[in-house]
Structures are given as C-alpha cells and as structure tokens.
Amino acid sequence: MPPVRAEKKRKTDLIEQVCVTNKAGELVDLEDVLEYGPYSLTGILSSEKDEQEPLFDESIVLGYSIKISPVWTYNLKDVPEKETMSIWIVTPQRRYGILSPSSEYKAIYEQISEKNRLFYLIKTKFKDDMISGTLEDYDNYIEVLKEKLELPSCFQAILLVQKHIRFLLTQMVATSSLHVWSESPFFIRIRSSYEHLILQINKNIYNARQERKKSKLSSNNPSDNNTTMKSSLNQALTLINLPEQPFSISSPTATPQLGVVKRTSPLRFPLNDIWLSGLRIVDPNIESISLWKRIQVSTSPKHQRYISLQEVCSVIAQQLQITNLEALNKLSSHGETLLQIMHTAFTWRGTKLFNDIKHAIGFRSSVQQARSQFRGYCYDYLFMHCNNGEKTSLHLLRTLICMKLDFSNAQLAAKILFHFLLFDIGSGLSGSDYTYEQYINHSAVAFSFTEEIFEKNFVTVLPDFVKLFSISFGYWPAFSFYDELLKLLRNKYPKVYSSTPNLCDQVWLDRTNLFPCNRSTRSTLPYRPTKLLDLASASSCLSKKETDFKQDTGLYSYNLEKVEALKVSPDLQTGIWSCPVQNCLYFAVCDNPYKPSQVIYDHLLGHVDSKFIFKTPSNSVRSFTNKLEHIMYNIN
C-alpha cells in the first residue's frame, strides 16, 4: 500500500481587541466586505485550537498583535446556546475567530452582533418550517422576532428588519443557498419590495470579486505588468483617435418637485396586494411614529372602524395646538408611512381612516381593487367576531344557520342576515362582483327557504337591514348588490330611502379597472358635495363637470374655475405657486407657468374644512372666504 500522506489542516486562533478598516484607514463594518472589500483586520491573539495536529509546528506566540490583510470574505457559524452567530475569518493556513472588539470598534461590533442574532432567528424559523412541512407567512416571522428579542411590539420588529435589510438580503442572495431561500415567504415578501437593493448588492459583489481576481493575477504574474501598461496605452490612443461627436442640446427637464419630508428611495408593495397595490414603502421617522401613537391613544378599539380623517385631524390639532389644516398637512405628508403601519396592524387595515388617508395622498382604488379589499375586510371582521374562542368563520356560519330565522323580530333577523352577507362576500373570489340574486339564492339555501318566500320576508326587514350598512366597511358601492338594494329600498320604502345616507357620496373609485403602480396626484375630490349647486353664491366659484363614471353611481367632481385675487397663476420665473393661506407651507411646481395646475384648485378646496386667514386680505378675498364658509356650512 502507498504511504498515507499527512494533510495539513487549518489551525484555529481566537482574536481579541479586533478593529477593521478599509483602504483609506476608516472604521468599517466587517460584514460589508463582500461588497466593498478588501478590508484589513487587526487584533491580539488570545488562544489557539488545532483542528488536527499539523505536520510542521507553525504556532504563533500568544498576546502579540496580528494583522490580516486583505480580507475578502467571512464565515458565520451558529451558536445555538446563545441563539446567535459568530464571525470567522478564513485564510489559506488558518481560521480566526473574533472574541471581542476594541474600544473604538465597539459600536460597530454591537451592530454586527445584532444583525447576526436577527439572521439566526430568521434562519432557524425557516429551517423549522421546512422540517415541519408548513411554511408560515411574513407576519409569523415578525411575531417570532418580537418574542425572541423581547420587543414591545411587532412594529419594533419590523423596524429592526428594515434597519438591517441590506445584511439580510446579502446573506440570502450572495450565498449558494438562494434556491432554498426563494421558497421562504419572508424572503418573497422583502424581495418584492427591495428589488433595486438586490440588484445593487449583486453588482457590488460582482465588482469586488473581479477586483479580487485581478489582485490574484497581478500577484501571481508580476511580469505581466508591462503588458497591462501597453494595453492601457493602446486604449488611451484609441479613445484619442475617436471621431468627434456632434454637439446637441437636450430638451429641458421638468423642475423636480420638492417633498415635505425627506424619504427613502421608492419601494413598492407587490401588485397582488389587496390593500395597497403599488404604494411606496418608506422608513418611518420620529414624527410619523409620534403621530401614530397619538392616533392609537385617542381612539378606542370599539371606534377604530368608524373614525375619519377629519376627526383625527381635529384631535391632533388640539393636542399640538395647531390648526386643522396644519394637522392635515402633517398626516398627509406622513400618509405613506401611516398606511404602512396600519397595513401591518390587523384591526386597522381597511378601516375608514385607512381609506381616507389613501385618498388624501392621491391613491386611487379601482373597482377590482376595492372588491378585493372589501372581501378581505369582511373576512377579518368575521375572524374578530367569532364566538367561544373559535378562530374560524365556519363556526360563525354554523351558529347563524342553527339560529331560527324569525322575521317577526326584524332587528334580530336583520343582524343574522347581515352577518351572513359578510360571510358570503368574504368567502367569494377576490375581484368578482356580488349581485342581489346571489344573496337571495345563497341565503335561501342556507336557511332552508324557497327563493320566493325568502325574498318576500326579506323585504319586510329591509329598513332594519339597510341601517347596518356603514362606510366603515369600505367600498360597498363596488358591488352591484348595493345599487340593486338601494333601488329596492326606493321602490318599497321611499321615506326610509330619503333618510338613508348614500355611501356612493363618500367613496371614491376609479372606474377604469386598472391597477395603478405609481402614486398619482389627486385631481378630484374624494367626496361629493350634494347641495353645492343649489347655492347661487357658489355658482361663480364652482362648476359641475361629469366624469367617466357610471350613471348609477352618481359621482361628480367639482373644480374651482378662477380666483384671481388668490394669485392662482405661479411665478413666471420659477414656476412655483405658494399657497396664500397663512401658516400653510404648501407649494406646487407647474410645468407651464402661464397655466395654473389642477393641483392648485384641489388644494384650495382643501381649505374648506378648516379655519384659515389669507396673507393679503382684500375685499375680493373677503368675499371669496365668505363663499367658502357658506359652502363649508352646507357640505357639513
């Protein structure tokens, strides 16, 4: 037999007082070396541990400083006892484990430890789900992080994930286990929102690897330096001899609009999201979090579904001692962040405040989108109102069917039929329509009636049934069932119909059946001032204009025509229009300085719901304010 060759294994050393720097000598995060390497690591040797007895004695004296350069990569090793991961630097001869940082590197090392523990918990959760065979969604990951890290709320866990999102994506994308992570619901959720960041990470890693290859080639072949210099010289000569390109003047670009607050780069929810299709995801700041806490404190859980944006503005205005208009500007400037927070909360998404903020920041809901959101909200409503701790809507359906449907008790029968309506809508297809015939057919089958008998008895409890409809459920007018129900109420009970509020006046839908990907500026009002045209004084300020909506909805838009006293036209030099209302910081950038933008008129109509004072009061301005106050009184 041939003699067994003793292979040389790596020795393991531990380093204390670690400090990591880049080429410029600046302190950097070691776990960014995959993108921005190479780095240099310095420290003091603490102890050593042999993997296998080496053939030659290459031990290093302990207690001496050591420098490892260049560092191109690192390894993470699980530490199950502490529920975290440790960092190891691997060289061709040795492995170096990091024990402790130096005093100047302590702050960065604490962030590294926080990232490693966060990734360990996410990886362990995904591994356990793979073993059990059930992959849970993103919300379950957030709950696990909240419990393991002992955070006060799930929102803090979401903030922690967003804080270290680049590191998490690097670990999931840059390693060879991308095909495994692609099945994780956690990775699918963050990948759809951070695609631009993934592209940037891959580009940086590719550039770092190319630089590493070049450094290896230059170190292995020092004689090739002359050839590289010749090639670079030839490239320079070819660039010099290129034909001269003709000079052209590009078209002037539009003036960029300045935001109220500094936001991050636009990130978007996936298009199949039923609540916020195409809305940006922004990092919350201190002001947005404080506004959210004020909203939570000022509203009780019973009234979460019914509170409106105007009521929230009045409450915040009283707390901060500002006007309602300033409170509305604050809420709308942080509208995307508030929607993101409410989207993660179970009881807030789909509420009236949720939809009001969507309309305030210019988000339009299509009919299909409204139906999907409404069905999801009905399902959530039944989930929250299940009895006996049962968390299935099927249990509620069984209790409804087992109850005797006595039409002599109109109020009880109306409640049972209304809850069955919510169950029937919530269990249907997301974007499909729901008709009156479907409700009669399904209800008759569920409660063991014929369709004729059930419809006759249903008409008797129709007034009590209609009273249960509320705008808090969102987009009732998105279904043809609501229009058919109002027509039946108008024919059978005209007096009740005259006193019943029409929810079409309070809901704004985009009837184009398109899913908008970008946040567009609101060019129309999200409500309908019904008594506006009856005022003779308001006819000179407002004009009626029919839109492309269906005639059965009765939705109209109202726009200001001209108000010369308010200087509607922007500045000719800058193209910027600033609002003349005192303490209002709103401004608009118009592409055509000779033509006022529609956004200006919409902003002026926003002052109708607040008390305001113009900067330069005159007789014409006073007459205009009186008209607006008169309009406001009739709208309310």
Swiss-Prot record:
It is found in: Cytoplasm; Mitochondrion; Nucleus; Chromosome. Keywords: Chromatin regulator, Chromosome, Cytoplasm, Mitochondrion, Nucleus, Transcription, Transcription regulation. InterPro entries: Cytosine_MeTrfase1_RFD. GO terms for cellular component: CLRC complex; cytoplasm; heterochromatin island; mating-type region heterochromatin; mitochondrion; nucleus; pericentric heterochromatin; rDNA heterochromatin. It holds the Pfam family DNMT1-RFD. Its main location: cytoplasm. GO terms for biological process: CENP-A containing chromatin assembly; silent mating-type cassette heterochromatin formation; siRNA-mediated pericentric heterochromatin formation; subtelomeric heterochromatin formation. Component of the Clr4 methyltransferase complex (ClrC) composed of at least clr4, rik1, pcu4, rbx1, raf1 and raf2. The cullin pcu4, rik1, raf1, raf2 and the ring-box protein rbx1 are components of an E3 ubiquitin ligase, whose activity is essential for heterochromatin assembly. Interacts with pcu4. Component of the Clr4 methyltransferase complex (ClrC) which contributes to the establishment of heterochromatin by specifically methylating histone H3 to form H3K9me. ClrC preferentially ubiquitylates H3K14 and ClrC-mediated H3 ubiquitination promotes clr4 methyltransferase activity for the methylation of H3K9. H3K9me represents a specific tag for epigenetic transcriptional repression by recruiting swi6/HP1 to methylated histones which leads to transcriptional silencing within centromeric heterochromatin, telomeric regions and at the silent mating-type loci. This is Rik1-associated factor 2. It comes from Schizosaccharomyces pombe (strain 972 / ATCC 24843). The lineage of its organism: Eukaryota, Fungi, Dikarya, Ascomycota, Taphrinomycotina. The gene is raf2.
